[in-house]
Amino acid sequence: MQEKTLTESIDAALSSIGEASRTTQPEIELRENGVVTTVLNGIALIRGLPGVGYEELVEMSGGVYGIAFNVDPDEVGVVLLGEYAKLQAGGRARRTGRVMDVPVGDGLLGRVVNPLGRPLDAEGEPRFSGRLPIERPSPGIMDRNAVSTPLQTGLKVVDAIVPIGRGQRELILGDRQTGKTAIAVATILNQKGRNVICIYCAIGQRASAVAKVLAQLREHGAMAHTVAVVTEGNDPSGLQYIAPYAATSIGEYFMEQGRDVLIVYDDLTNHARAYRELSLLLKRPPGREAFPGDIFYVHSRLLERSTHLRKELGGGSLTALPIIETEAQNISAYIPTNLISITDGQIYLSPTLFELGNLPAVDIGKSVSRVGGKAQLAAYRSVTGRLKLAYAQFEELENFARFGTRLDEASRKAITHGERIRECLKQDELDVLGVEEQILILLSLSEGQFDPLELSEVSGAMKRLSAAARELPRDLLERLHSDRPLSDEDRRRLLQTAEAALQKKRTAGRL
């Protein structure tokens, strides 16, 4: 009896195994596994991954990731991302079958993250809506719209002389410690309440410098509309290299939703150096200044992603402010000339003007905006044309007067007027002004109302004009912010307001 029961149990078990084998389809997955042969200064050399693709993400022992940069038949050169101290030769490596991507979404607003999307602000993991590749093709020609809307920086010299439009790429360049980052930060602060998303991308910056910028943004309430993507100087070169691409993908997410985005790359000099270091370690042929031959393409494919999309695609825009550091005022060096040719204009900051206290130290003669003028508000165009000409004449006469030449009355008046223009274009760091304040000051300046004042009185006069501008009638404010030129009646009302504000000081002085 027991034998029969045992036999039946065995038969039933074998039958179930047979049935399972007929219905079960085993899943076989082929994976390429390689071996790390060399780890050196932020790169790794791997053997045994013959099918890996260019810029494919590679996972190595200890959870270290890298991007395949050199794809040779026998060996793959991988740029390491993140901490790699525990990675050693002999470690395992495998393909992931995907490219590097970054988390995107509204949950990143107000956060400080690294290019991998990992938080640096001790506020926990950020909420995100999805992921986008860090390398994306730039919009086609037929997907773009003309730059037609101004992006106000809050700085008189920029908004009046070298205006920036939404979707433009405006280079900021100058020697170290001349106020390049200050202009970019002021522009971010001025977007508060203007429905513009801002992205600050720090590339290989000192931790103290980044902390200062973030403190300024928080102090002025600008972090609510800002995402900070940060790499420090001690981060691996690979992480510094991907930082601007990751930040741009975050910005493109908002742009494709029809929103306006401003992105600051601080700075692309460090980015170029990081790419040069990686290329030399991977034994790529060096070119001019030891940079690899494709350094122009590295930056052009990044900046071409900034644009103003046509209405059918949402009408969003991505405005780029790349920053470049020059050496000894040499703007004809390799990287600066590359960026000047890629961008739509440049703002050059002169160390000479900086040392003289003319802040922001914008050299008007070497600064230009190739497309922003078409986006500038009409009220600016009504007042800045004469200012540019007067200032150019003043600079020429000032150089001439240094030789001790006696000047006629007209020349002396031109110098007096030019000195007031230069004084009016000065602005304290992060002290941004609204459109109505700038236009009232510039109109009063162009009409010579500042000429009777002493230079020491100009700063106080501008403050009184700013206060008066904030009290202008609503209908006049709306016209100043519109694209309609100033009418004769508008000019008369503005000049009366300016004269009344300036008269207060004179009356107070007589009393």
From Swiss-Prot:
Keywords: ATP synthesis, ATP-binding, Cell inner membrane, Cell membrane, CF(1), Hydrogen ion transport, Ion transport, Membrane, Nucleotide-binding, Translocase, Transport. The record marks S367 as: Required for activity. It is an enzyme of class 7 (translocase). It catalyses: ATP + H2O + 4 H(+)(in) = ADP + phosphate + 5 H(+)(out). The keyword Cell membrane applies. ATP binds at G174, D175, R176, Q177, T178, G179, K180, T181. Pfam families: ATP-synt_ab (PF00006), ATP-synt_ab_C (PF00306), ATP-synt_ab_N (PF02874). One of its GO terms (cellular component) is proton-transporting ATP synthase complex. Its EC number is 7.1.2.2. PROSITE patterns: ATPASE_ALPHA_BETA (PS00152). The keyword Acyltransferase does not apply. Belongs to the ATPase alpha/beta chains family. F-type ATPases have 2 components, CF(1) - the catalytic core - and CF(0) - the membrane proton channel. CF(1) has five subunits: alpha(3), beta(3), gamma(1), delta(1), epsilon(1). CF(0) has four main subunits: a(1), b(1), b'(1) and c(9-12). Produces ATP from ADP in the presence of a proton gradient across the membrane. The alpha chain is a regulatory subunit. NCBIfam families: alt_F1F0_F1_al, atpA, PRK13343.1. This is ATP synthase subunit alpha 1. It comes from Chlorobium luteolum (strain DSM 273 / BCRC 81028 / 2530) (Pelodictyon luteolum).
